[in-house]
Amino acid sequence: MGKKKIATLSAILSLSITSGVSSTTAYADNKETNYINENDVKLNGKVSEALQSNMKIELENGMTKPIYSLDEAIIENLFVETEVDSDRDGKKDRVSVKVMRPKTDSNVKVPVIYEMSPYRAGLKDVPVYNVDEELYAYEGKPYGAVNLGSYGNYYVPRGYAVILGESIGTGKSEGCPTTGDEQEILGTKSVIDWVNGRAKAYKENGEEVKADWSTGNVGMTGVSYNGTLPNAVATTGVEGLKTIIPIAAISSWYDYYRANGAVIAPGGYQGEDTDNMAEAVLTRENPEVCGQVIKELTAGQDRKTGNYNDFWDKRNYVKDAKNVKASVFVVHGLNDWNVKTKQFAQWWEALGENNVPRKMWLHQGGHGGTSTNDWQRTQNKWFDYWLYGIENGIMNEPMVDVQRENKTWDKMKNWPDPSAVPSKVRMYLSNKAVNLPLSMGSVNKMFSFVDDAKMKSNQLVANPELEVANRLVYTMPVLQKDTRISGTPKISITGNIDRSVSNLTALLVDYGGAKPEIVTRGWMDPQNVKSIENSTAIQPGKDYTFTWDMQPDDYVFKAGHQIGVVLMASDYDYTIRPKAGTKLTVKLSEVTLPIVK
């Protein structure tokens, strides 16, 4: 597909984190009280006795409190040697990092909070893909010198070092951006290796610098791409990485740019893909040396078919959850249409299957974190527990916090809600909204709709009682009580297409408020009827059964409202937008909702 400059990537994924009590001092001094003997300090065994004797902190409410001066903070700009050569110049790439740490006595050691980012040197405006074209039919900026930033300003006074890095190919770092593959992972991992004495770092003048001030314990965090890299590095099982807090983070890049074989955009960034993402963050000197790497991204992502292949498999962290040794605190917005909710849901499930210590917050915001629910305090306690070994009760809290639509928070043992039951509803087909029984029924009608990619979803969900040629609408009876879903809705339809290619889109809609609200949605390429790995030639007019998932959600439909399902072909904001006219005929439709009993 050719490229056309119809938008820029000036803000791709880029977000910053919104972010009278007795005290106890625990410190190392040969002539004073040893940390481990402090009666008021409860330890959890996460830090060895040897390290405990080299730490100096003061606690308040079970958390580290600020005791170190920001004005005296030590700041170093260094280059850490990685084990990769992503720009293929015959030399190991070096990544640029800023290290900020408290000024301490020489025998005091501190843990590290670490964020790697491709965004520190800004983003370039690059062309993205033109999505107004036909579908493919299968045939057979440098750091500021004195600003410690939000992490540094908060955590350095509390006895933490903060390391901010520039990922390969960005800013002052060497190498080439590779959008989430092993080279990017290992480039990020190298900083943890350096903190633990397994890699080397240098000043700009070539002088080697050791991290002899560190305990070796590292916690990674970040939002969006910056939160994705912690997920990725955790799958290496690297020694020293004790915990991660991925916020609005990707767990599989395929599910960021594809859905069931369909080419899908991140919300707000139509036409974006792995190659122009890499181009946007390619802010190193001499970016032309990465030309071949970008070409390989273009080829590997296979935008033509949308199939899952080895390229995507290398960027799928979910399958490697078995290697995760760090604890994980997931934070995600239930209304995030950039990094969609499947990203947290599949990661959370995989972590649970592998007995990874975990915690999760799901908030009502979009792409980013949350400042509500006493977030900063909780983050502080989490890092203290895993990096300083403070027993502060954080792991005794319910594992999941979910923010409700009215902004209150519910605490849960797990997610999806263990009380959620997959409930199938076979829908009588009509081009008008009808009250449907919540039980199976015989169906002997069929109805058709015609694709028009220029019609936006808010138009297609409106006025469900009217016949509209470009959609089918089904509504269930008016709800007699609040009805909550928790998990992943699924759709299954039987029917045919009059062409060999189309998009398929399903919307789950809340009818009954001031205006229809799209709760969640899902997409499919019908040519992936058998698997996401392989396309199957679709015979026009032949009946097939297509089944696909919508994005996971936790949502309450209010009493007096109606649950609706809208079927359409192309989705203006997310799918490729082919010319109008494809006719789809549906003979049977069934939705499965994870209803909390």
Curated annotation (Swiss-Prot):
One of its GO terms (molecular function) is serine-type peptidase activity. The keyword 4Fe-4S does not apply. Pfam families: Peptidase_S15, PepX_C. Its EC number is 3.4.14.11. GO terms for biological process: proteolysis. It comes from the Bacteria. The active site is at residues 224, 336, 367. SMART domains: PepX_C (SM00939). InterPro entries: AB_hydrolase_fold, CocE/Ser_esterase, Galactose-bd-like_sf, Pept_S15_Xpro, Xaa-Pro-like_dom, Xaa-Pro_dipept_C. It catalyses: Hydrolyzes Xaa-Pro-|- bonds to release unblocked, N-terminal dipeptides from substrates including Ala-Pro-|-p-nitroanilide and (sequentially) Tyr-Pro-|-Phe-Pro-|-Gly-Pro-|-Ile. The keyword Membrane does not apply. It is an enzyme of class 3 (hydrolase). Transmembrane segments: none annotated. Keywords: Aminopeptidase, Hydrolase, Protease, Serine protease. Belongs to the peptidase S15 family. This is Putative Xaa-Pro dipeptidyl-peptidase.
